[in-house]
Amino acid sequence: LDFVDKIIGISSDVEFEHFDPGKLVPTLEALDAVSSGSVDAAYATSGYWQGKINSASLFAAVPFGPEAGEFMGWILYDDGAALWQEMYDTNGYNVVATPCGVIAPETSGWFKNEINGVEDLEGLNMRFFGLGAKVMEKVGVSTSLLSAGDIFPALERGAIDATEFSMPKIDARLGFHKIAKFNYFPGWHQPSTLFELLINKDVYEELTDVAKKQIEVACLANITTNLAEGEATNYAAMVDNVENNGVTLKQWSPEMLALFEEKWNEVAAELADGDPFFQKVWADMQEYRAGYKVWSNNIYLPRN
C-alpha cells in the first residue's frame, strides 16, 4: 500500500503495518472493526458502507458527479472533509476519517455480451459498487457488492453475469478480461473515487500532534501519486486488452447515458427525501458544484 510506504518514510512518531484485504477482517466489516478497536486502522473507500449509511458513497464516488480535481476541492477547501467526519460521528462510529487517496475514472463494467439497449441489461446479475448500484437496479439489473477477491470466482461459476470494479490497470490484475470480453466506458458511476484512512478515535487521540500531522501529510502525498498513476498507466492496460486479450472497448450511447443519469436523479431525490443527512451533504455538494462551474466552464478547453 503506497500510504504505508509514505508514512514509514516520513514518520518519527507513528508506525503502520500493512495487511492485505481480508487478512485481519473481511473488507466489508472494516469500519465496524476499526470503530470497535478490533483493528487500529483501515484504508478503504466509504462506498463499502453504503448498506450501513446512505450518505457514505457521497464521500466515495457520485454518479455523474465531480471528477478528481473538483471532488478534492470540495473535500479539502470546502465543507467535504468536515461533513465526512460528521457522518461517522452522527452514526455512532468511533473513528477519525482522513481523506487519503483518489483515483481516476473507472470503467463502466465488464460484460459477457454486447449491450445494445436497456433490454440487454434486464435480468443480469452484476457486481456493482455504491450509489451506481441503485441506478442499475432501476434499469432491471440485480446487483451485489463483492470484495475484489470474490469477483472473478463469481464470474467464472456464473453467479454474476457482469462486473465493475476499478480502472483498467487494476481490473487487469483481477482477470476479468478472461471471461467478460466487452468493456464499457465511460464510468458514469465513478467519475473519480475517494479513499479514506480510518483510525480508531481512541487510538488517534493518543497520538502526538506531530504524528497526526505526519499522517495528514502522507495522505496528501498519497492523493497526489494515486491520481498521477491513474492518469499515466491505464491506457497501456486498455491497449493490451484489445491487442492481446480479445477485449472490445465499447462506449455507452448518448441514449443509454441519458437513461442512467435520469435514473440517478431519481435515486438521489429518493435518498434525500428519506434521509436528512444525505439531503444536507447532497445540497452542500450541489451548491459547491454550481460555483465550481463558473470556473470550469470558462477556464478549460472543450474536451471533445
Residue ranges of model-derived segments:
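Divalent-metal coordination cores built from histidine and acidic residues
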Residues: 83
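N-terminal secretory/targeting leader peptides
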Residues: 1-71, 86-304
